């Protein structure tokens, strides 16, 4: 019996296992079989404590502290430590840190991620060495617009970071020595060296010692005639002979001695030559391509590639006129000078310095060095009389990082890292990162494009616009004599901008070649007069002849003190005014040293990507298409060349273009005045442009660009595809008292006000004869604000989830919410401690501030969910996980075994719905089936949704979901519980049969087979055993019967034998008797008959004996009948 049970178990067990396995497969097929979290390292430990953000820092040249990161796990990249950059989540937890000083760690991270998310080294040669990064500092970062897991980091030499200078209030006395140079020998003054500096300086502290070639003896070339101011002859006055720059004849104003010689360009360059920068990696900036993969917890980022940026990349694309040597041997175009005793402006808009030059007209073929952009007038851009890209300008141009699909751009910085207003950006660097392979990281190629060629399409149709009669001097000629340099505030190209890049900046202008810092010229009516027309003025400069000007051939002093001077006092040719088409302007006779106005425009990314690597005169037409539209640019107001003559500081209270266009706007509408009113009049540098952002206006339903200009926030509407949208700037002023105030004062001829360009004295050294080539900055009675107002203290500008613009200074912050195009709701936020940095995160209506002396950050957030007011949280962030849970709660997807199979019986189209914002989400009735969520305690009714971020529309077999909650009007991703990482979840196996169908379909056949086998084995085996036993029983019975039969036969034989003997003896008598009685024969005795043995009954057990047959009785003898 035991053997039988064992055999049954062996037979049934494999079949049962097969059945159970099939049943398990059927059940698991209705569950998610691909639960793949995206950008997730894994669950954090349950202590709820994470790595905190280190002390944040800021790089002023690009006004960069942090980059808001989009994607599944949003957050920010933040400049930390002294050289590093850290990746944080939305709540201040550090995920990874890139430290260029830790080259051992970076060496192990060079490579790429394979399909299994493993960091793999390249199998071939790597063309870079991360040890070259040890001498560099991370100063900026950007996220690739096409690949959210790719970041590009900008690193510059440590030497440049160490040179960053503390900003100063823009007051004259802060920059230059108060003592005026002694009067006397003009040539001696022209070559004087400032105390401790060894160089002359510009108004911004940028002037270097004039080239040695300029120290030749004073003389006139060829004719050799004297051109003295008091003995000028008609012949000399009309001579086309260029004079030596550093001669007695050269009366161009000379710069005053710098207060701090370290601010001169020569000191900043510090012997770092153009050639050395191009050959030494430690002096070059570098762009590092970093690939983030948060599947890999050990190596969450990989260094995939690097590209060094050389100044030669830009200089190689300078137009040919920029690199030609001097044609006249003088490196200037000054012919002679006119003298006037009254440099002050007068009512008829004449404006004259004590001395002003006549210049040789610049032709389209004139070498740039022989125009006013010469080594003498722009020494900050020359080295050994060659127009190159010196150290100060090179470092300034390393900023404005932007990347899309492997094409990385540097649009430049604003130059505020040094106190030298000539530190500006001259062009755009473009670096192409090719796709990597398993063998190598791919090639890189860097080229530079000067703004002089990228902005050459600037045009202006005055008749169509009906604006100014004298458009601004931004026009370009075919010889490219206008050299625009920009203080770049930043660029923005959101995904909704159709590939256009918005550029916010301030820009230099060309001039008509007057004084070398000439930023003003006559009114349009004066300019269009004939060059030989002269007017008579008195000793005060007032116009004497009220009728038509008198045509004479020379300036002529009169006996009554009057003097005849050229009506067109600077030149005999027009300036580079903007024309109705590109590249048809007259050449610029001069270029300003400093930025003169705001400048915004849009560039086409597709064109920038496809530009030839080399600019030539033959392919220059391609570069004129870099702008979205040559007519779509703005100076913030009308596009004319008016100039300021008032001493009044412009508080600039206008907000709209309509106000600027009104008849009462006057000089407030002038682009130069606007820039100075927003910056220098409030203590800012004119280059203090920054923080370009892109946000949406709820009321106008339009996107708008915002950026900071000194003490105000400006906006510029997005350029539409029809190219006809007005592109003017709107201004939003912050509280004026935060930037200081002035006390009105009357200025007389003996009063010297604080003027930025007042550092330039006339050649005589006469203090009253100085050349005022710029706007008044502020009066000496300026009172700074106690709140902090300089650009150094400005920490950032950002748009948030609720479309707010945040601005903050050292002890005060603003949350500025645009209600429409003209109105802001301004909330001031007081801070008890000074802010050293601000970290912006785009996904929350809050930001982090680094308070002075603190080791971690504080949050500035809404007072309550129902309030729009922001306030500083007095407590430092010590637990980012708790901070997160208090805002958005926490959640996790339910385990696959706990998701009901009924969820997967649906079709994907039946469980997905579309919300009002156009996003596809999981129907709310299914959320609890697959996701478990714990809301924040103070907001239990927070709205939760599962966003569909991917699904198969063709096969309808998978869906990927991301949990989000509604915070401050925007949906924010919810991280996994007890983790700092956000993850999405992928589900497959939809449109499944009901849960019972497949198991039953599989189980029934298996059960039938098992039953059949069980029955067959349970019945067949015993029947076989019984049959065998029956056979054995029959055999035994038969054998016994045979034995019995034999025995009976023997008995009968014996009886027969006995009977036969007896009968034989009696036979005669018997026979006779029988014969007598013939009527009846004697009966034959019956044979003894044994009973047939009964058939054997069913044995109760094998081997039972059959019942023995009854013994037969002996037959009775037959009686004899007589």
Curated annotation (Swiss-Prot):
Disulfide bonds: none annotated. Residues 1-26 form the signal peptide. It is a single-pass type I membrane protein. InterPro entries: Adhesin_P1, P1_N. Residues 1079-1122 have a biased composition (Low complexity). Residues 182-208, 244-273, 541-562, 1066-1122 are annotated as: Disordered. Its main location: membrane. Keywords: Cell membrane, Cytadherence, Membrane, Signal, Transmembrane, Transmembrane helix. One of its GO terms (cellular component) is plasma membrane. Residues 195-208 have a biased composition (Gly residues). The chain crosses the membrane at residues 1001-1021. One of its GO terms (biological process) is adhesion of symbiont to microvasculature. Residues 259-273 have a biased composition (Polar residues). The keyword Cell membrane applies. Could be involved in cytadherence. This is Adhesin P1.
